[in-house]
Structures are given as structure tokens and as C-alpha cells.
A protein has these predicted regions:
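Short C-terminal tail/terminal secondary-structure segment
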Residues: 201, 212-227
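Substrate-binding pocket helix/loop in short-chain dehydrogenase/reductase
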Residues: 74-75, 82-87, 178-181
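Residue(s) in the substrate-gating loop at a strand-loop-helix junction
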Residues: 118
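Active-site helix of classical SDR
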Residues: 98, 134
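Active-site loop-to-helix junction immediately N-terminal to the catalytic Tyr of the SDR YXXXK motif
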Residues: 78, 124-132, 144
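Alpha-helical segment proximal to the catalytic Tyr-Lys
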Residues: 103, 146-151, 209
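N-terminal Rossmann NAD(P)H-binding glycine-rich loop of SDR-like oxidoreductase domains
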Residues: 10, 14, 18
Length: 227
């Protein structure tokens, strides 16, 4: 059993990852919101990634940082604080987690880190300036740390397209919007959190032991194909 620390594991993609990996691993979830999820292998710590000190643990084999934001505004209405806040949540929060648990990860026989990017760093999309800047920082972090931490610690990121989660509910607000979003993607679908969770489970497993420093698009074809 691996000891997995998941930050932001009570909603959306993070919650789906917890459900995907908890049967065969010890999972510690750090999140602001507690749920009624219960499992012998699951421990919850109330935690705010922006302000709280990361708790101490005896061992960490895998670190997964899930917090993100969808702050979509035209550049004319985005404030500097919007950029700062998105960068703090997406990048600084992840850096704090890595720095806190890096020594424990280096002691593991099978250490890995998983972060989250977005397809908006690969594809020019209106109103995505703030989140794209922040997630581009994640892309750079993964590439740099992939080189720096090898061979002891692997690090990768998943870059999803819009995913059917609570975070995206304001965008996927009615059937017409959902239909249009489906049509924009060459594979004619919207990504589910369970699909992302299965990819996450693979990337932290021994089956992915040769993979590090990579950002994996889960994009339903929107980045790679012309629809």
C-alpha cells in the first residue's frame, strides 16, 4: 500500500481520485470541505491550501495537488489580484506542498507527484488569461522538477479540457451550452472526473515508472484535432 496525500480531494476530480485509489492505498485528504465519505484507508484533515501549514506525516509515497480555478474574464476586467490569486492557488500552493513533503518522497521506493494543468495553456482561448498564466507555471514546474528530482521522484501533470464537475457548473449551466461544448470537441463528449481519476491512478502507479516530466492532455481532441 502506498501512502498518498491528496490536496483538494473532496470535490470534482480530487474526489474521484480518492474513490479510485482508496481501496488499495492509504489516502490522506487535505481539504477545506469535509464530506461523509468513509473508508478504513481514508483520513481527512481540514485544510486551506492558501493559508494553513501543511501537516506532518511519517511517510509519503505520492503527492497529488488538485486545487484549481476557472476565473474566466476578458483582460479588461481582470484585476492584478485575479492574476495573483490564481497564481497563489495553482502554483504557490503546489510548490508549498512539494517543498513540505519532498524529503519524505525521496525516502520512498516509489515516489511520484501529480499536478493539474489545463488545455488552455496549449490552445488560445478567450477569457482564459489568468488561469492560463497560472497553469503555464504548473507546466514549467513539472518539466523542471522532472529533471531535478530524477531518479528518486517522478512528477507529471494532467491537462484536462472542461470536465463535468462542480467547478465547471457555471459554464455548463444548461443543456444548450453543454450541447455546444460537446460539438466543439472532435470526440463529441465532455470529460468526466472518473476518466481523469483513472489516468491519475495510472500515473502514480508502477505501470508508469518510466514516465516523468510530462503533461498529458485529456482534451477530447480539442488541442490535437481540427473539428
Amino acid at each position: 500500500m502506498k501512502n498518498i496525500v491528496i490536496i483538494g480531494g473532496t470535490k470534482g476530480i480530487g474526489k474521484a481520485i480518492v474513490s479510485e485509489v482508496v481501496d488499495n492505498n492509504n489516502v490522506v485528504c487535505l481539504s477545506r470541505n469535509q464530506t461523509d465519505f468513509n473508508h478504513d484507508n481514508y483520513t481527512f484533515h481540514k485544510f486551506d491550501a492558501l493559508v494553513d501549514d501543511y501537516p506532518d506525516f511519517d511517510s509519503v509515497d505520492c503527492l497529488i495537488y488538485c486545487p484549481g480555478s476557472i476565473n474566466l474574464k476578458p483582460i479588461s476586467t481582470l484585476s492584478l489580484d485575479d492574476f495573483r490569486n490564481d497564481f497563489e492557488l495553482n502554483v504557490i500552493g503546489a510548490v508549498r506542498a512539494v517543498k513540505k513533503y519532498l524529503n519524505l518522497l525521496k525516502k520512498s521506493e516509489s515516489a511520484s507527484i501529480l499536478l493539474f494543468s489545463t488545455v488552455a495553456t496549449k490552445l488560445g482561448m478567450p477569457y482564459h488569461a489568468s488561469v492560463s498564466v497560472a497553469k503555464s507555471g504548473i507546466d514549467g514546474l513539472v518539466k523542471t522538477l522532472g529533471s531535478e528530482l530524477a531518479p528518486k521522484v517522478r512528477i507529471n501533470a494532467i491537462a484536462p479540457t472542461i470536465t463535468n464537475t462542480e467547478l465547471a457548473s457555471k459554464i455548463l449551466r444548461n443543456d444548450k451550452v453543454i450541447e455546444n461544448m460537446v460539438e466543439r470537441h472532435p470526440l463529441k463528449k465532455i470529460l468526466s472526473s472518473n476518466e481523469v481519476a483513472k489516468m491519475a491512478s495510472f500515473l502514480i502507479s508502477e505501470d508508469a515508472s518510466s514516465i516523468s516530466g510530462q503533461i498529458f492532455n485529456m482534451d477530447a481532441g480539442i488541442v490535437s484535432f481540427k473539428s
